[in-house]
Each structure stands twice: as C-alpha cells, then as structure tokens.
Regions:
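Bacterial N-terminal signal peptides that target proteins for export
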Residues: 1-14
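Sec/Tat signal peptide C-region and signal peptidase I cleavage site
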Residues: 22-27
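N-terminal segment of the mature folded domain
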Residues: 28-157, 300, 335-336
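Short beta-strand->loop
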Residues: 35-37, 129-131, 149-176, 190-194, ...
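A bilobed periplasmic-binding-protein/Venus flytrap-type ligand-binding module shared by bacterial periplasmic
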Residues: 124-133, 248-265, 282-286
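Short helix-loop capping/hinge motifs at secondary-structure junctions, enriched
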Residues: 132-138, 157, 170-178, 257-265
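Ligand-binding pocket segment of bilobal, Venus flytrap-like solute-binding proteins
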Residues: 175-242
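Extracellular/periplasmic juxtamembrane helices and adjacent flexible linkers that interface
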Residues: 258-338
Length: 338
C-alpha cells in the first residue's frame, strides 16, 4: 500500500507539474495601445498597472498597456490615418464618430457597447486662477474685462477646448435677453482675450502654470485640481462658474485593429474594467466624476455642486460641430488670429 500510495503521489505531482508547465506555455505576452486625449496620463497610468495585474492573475498573460496622448481631434485623425490603437479614450463622441465614418476602423454602433453611452467618467469645465484671485474672476462675464488674459486650447485640435467654448456659449445664450447674435459677440470678445491657442489641454495648463502666461485657465475640472495639487501647490484657486457643461469623454474598441491583432477579449475587458468600483475610485482620486451612482456621496465630498448643460441640450455633437467648429463656422468667424 505504501508503494501504491507513493506511486499515486508521484503521478499527482507529475500531473500538477505538467499543468503548470502547460499553463506557462500557453501564457502570452500581450500589448494594448490606448490612444487618449491630453490630460488623462495620470489616470490611465494608475488604472493600467492595476488592470494588467488583474489580467495576469486571471489568464496568466503578461499585459503591457501603452498610452498615447494629445489633442482629441489630432488623436482621432492619427487613428484614422493608421495608428493601430486597440482602444480609444477620447474627449468627444464626435471624434470617435469621425473614425467610424471616415476610416470605418470603429463600428458605427460603438456607443452601445458599454454603459452610459460608453462614457465611464464625466468632468466639467472650471476656471483656474492665480492665488487670491487678483483679477476678481467669478463668472464668464469677468473673462472679457479689459485687463484679463484667458488661456484655452485650440478647438480645432483639442476636445477640451470645444467643451470650454460650448460652456462659454451656453452661458452667453442663458443671459437675460441672450440671443445667437449676443452669444456670438461674447465669444468674439472672449477669444480676443486669448494670447495663445495651444493644441491640447495639457499644453494650455503648462502655458498657464509654468510659463506664467494669463490670468485664468479654462480647464477640465480634473486638470484644474491636478494643477492646484501637484503642478503649483499653493499657487492657484479654482473658481466654479454659474453655468458649465457636462463633459462626457467616451471610450471605444477599435474593431479593425483588435480583430487583426487578436486583442478583442482583453480590450473589451480593459474598457469594462473602467466601470468597476475599483477603477471608479481611481477616477475620483484623479479628479474625474464617477458614473457609478453608489459612489455619488463619496464623490460629492470632493466635487462642488454645479449647474451644467449637456451636449444634447446643444443639439448633439453633429449639429454643434457643424454650427461651431466646421470650416467657416462660428469659431472661424469670431477668432482673429494673433
């Protein structure tokens, strides 16, 4: 019996060793490329490491997630022109729609693939001013005072810049007696106070924070908090305007790329992970507003209440883009190049 037991034990050990060997042999080295908009570097650096660890524990596969950042419109054009992103996490739905329509590398129904129209987090637009708010900036109307310089990126290349512009437009239209013409005049006045248009939100932040240009930065809320906390601690204040915009930066799988590379399963798991409580808490930590309603109270301790309009209130992205940002549209009409 002892000999038989020893034999069974040897067979069992061999079986376990073989299973481990097969598991190791089957494990793969995978890479994903996340092409994102400008100020998401810190958010995805933290999320990527945690997701890669979870994926390896689940599958045995070693996963490396690479990031590419820039103005949302520029990033969309890069993917259109052949950059092999497995996923895109951009500032505007219209940028993803552009890829779906032009190169067709993303399926047209991308918005239906993940919750909340494929938007895992939201943000808004606030003002970042220098400590003590020396120019007394409280609302959009203060941005056109004679001695105020405003820093904002170029809406031709930056998704954040389009949110900035639309928030300003919505405020102007909402004023007593506000009309299309008065809103257009306000935008013309506002952009006459902009000394430089950077190509992306992070570039504008560095212009304001490091180059010390301007009195107020129109910024993603997360970028304003980051600047206040890390880029210039004690040097800036955040001002919440009376009306802003609900910024909804969406995500999508780049279907033609993942099917070519065989990464659809891991790409889908990666974007689904963004909706988990773990990733949603990382979003809060990085100053994004979560979409998970169970975290609303937790998020409310950090984020001030704010009245917002949505892109739907402004007619949707197709209409807004055609009206404001297409060649010859309102932005081209009101912006006088320096």
């Amino acid at each position: 019996m002892t000999t038989l037991s020893a034999l069974f034990r040897s067979v069992s050990i061999a079986a376990v060793s073989l299973t481990a060997l097969l598991s190791t042999a089957q494990a793969k080295d995978l890479t994903l490329l996340n092409v994102s908009y400008d100020p998401t570097r810190e958010l995805y650096q933290e999320i990527d490491g945690i997701f890669a660890k979870h994926w390896q524990e689940k599958t045995g596969d070693k996963l490396t997630i690479k990031q590419s950042h820039g103005g949302s419109g520029s990033q969309a054009r890069s993917v259109d022109n052949g950059l092999d992103a497995d996923v895109v996490t951009l500032a505007l739905a219209i940028d993803i729609n552009s890829i779906a329509r032009k190169s067709k590398r993303i399926n047209a129904d991308w918005e239906t693939k993940f919750p909340h129209n494929s938007t895992p987090f939201t943000s808004t637009i606030v003002f970042l001013v220098r400590k003590g708010n020396p120019k007394g900036i409280r609302d959009w109307g203060d941005l056109t005072k004679p001695d105020v310089q405003v820093i904002t990126p170029n809406p031709k290349t930056s998704g954040g810049a389009r949110w900035n512009y639309l928030a300003a437009y919505a405020w102007a239209k909402a004023q007593p007696g506000g009309t299309e013409e008065s809103a257009k005049q306000y935008l013309k006045d506002l952009y006459s106070h902009v000394p430089v248009l950077d190509s992306g939100a992070r570039g504008s932040t560095l212009t304001f924070v490091q180059r010390q240009i301007g009195d107020v930065l129109l910024a993603w809320e997360n970028e304003a908090f980051l600047a206040q906390k890390e880029l210039g601690k004690g040097q800036f204040d955040i001002v919440v305007p009376s009306l802003s915009v609900l910024a909804e930066p969406p995500v999508a799988i780049v279907d033609k790329v993942v099917d070519k590379r065989g990464t659809r399963e891991v790409a889908s798991a990666y974007l689904n992970f963004l909706y988990t409580p773990e990733a949603q808490r990382i979003a809060i930590k990085n100053f994004y507003r979560p979409t998970d309603p169970s975290l609303a109270e937790e998020a409310g301790k950090l984020f001030p209440p704010l009245k917002t309009v949505s892109i739907a209130d402004l007619g949707g992205w197709d209409a807004a883009n055609q009206k404001h940002f297409a060649d010859g549209a309102i932005f081209d009409q009101i912006y006088l190049k320096k």
